[in-house]
Amino acid sequence: MYPKRIDIIKKIVENVGEKEIIVSNIGIPSKELYYVKDRERNFYMLGSMGLASSIGLGLALNCEDKVIVIDGDGSILMNLGSLSTIGYMNPKNYILVIIDNSAYGSTGNQKTHTGKNTNLEEIAKGCGLDTITTESLEEFEKEFKNALNEEKCKVIIAKTIPYNEKCSNIEIPPVVLKYRFMEAIKRS
């Protein structure tokens, strides 16, 4: 059985240091990241579905720190062009973790096409990206640790069950989060 998204997020947080930047996609995944561990170097995407991968790319191209993006299959499907751009730019400090639960988790778990005929690994590989799909928590952690220690762009597609952890809303106002994040990455 596939793991839950929150368990993947916990493994990400357990394995990053203080220097890594984490960008999380819209809605519940951002709330889950905040619930697991709020950090100044977390960027919580609160308003634009499909743009976390592009925001992470911009950060990776403009800083030396490792940038980890937590995105969903639904968000990636809304912005497939981001994979092509990431593959073209190919930043060595970029890890894209696609949580593939075959559902639009933040809007009620409506099914996405990845549960049928859309293969995100093949799409990402077609864009020139080093990509692997994991189906267990142990396999994900192994691949994520490897990616953290490599100097190359990596996409990890983590198959998960469609499940939303019950988490409260992020209590810090978005404008405060923005400035806190900007100050944190300026110091690196």
From Swiss-Prot:
- Please name the GO terms of the biological process aspect recorded for this protein, alphabetically: coenzyme M biosynthetic process
List the EC numbers from the record: 4.1.1.79
Q: What pathway does the annotation place this protein in?
A: Cofactor biosynthesis; coenzyme M biosynthesis; sulfoacetaldehyde from phosphoenolpyruvate and sulfite: step 4/4
**Regulation of its activity:** Inhibited by oxygen when heated in air at 80 degrees Celsius. The enzyme is reactivated by addition of dithionite.
What molecular function terms (GO) are annotated for this protein?
Answer: sulfopyruvate decarboxylase activity; thiamine pyrophosphate binding
Q: Does the keyword Phosphoprotein apply?
A: no
Q: What keywords appear on the UniProt entry?
A: Coenzyme M biosynthesis, Decarboxylase, Lyase, Thiamine pyrophosphate
Cofactors required: thiamine diphosphate
According to the record, cofactor stoichiometry and binding are noted as:
Binds 1 thiamine pyrophosphate per subunit.
Q: Which InterPro entries match?
A: Sulfopyruvate_deCO2ase_bsu, THDP-binding, TPP_dependent_decarboxylase, TPP_enzyme_TPP-bd
Q: Does the keyword Lyase apply?
A: yes
**Catalytic activity of the protein:** 3-sulfopyruvate + H(+) = sulfoacetaldehyde + CO2
Q: Which family does it belong to?
A: Belongs to the TPP enzyme family.
Describe the subunit structure.
Heterododecamer composed of 6 subunits alpha and 6 subunits beta.
* Function summary: Involved in the biosynthesis of the coenzyme M (2-mercaptoethanesulfonic acid). Catalyzes the decarboxylation of sulfopyruvate to sulfoacetaldehyde.
Q: What is this protein called?
A: Sulfopyruvate decarboxylase subunit beta
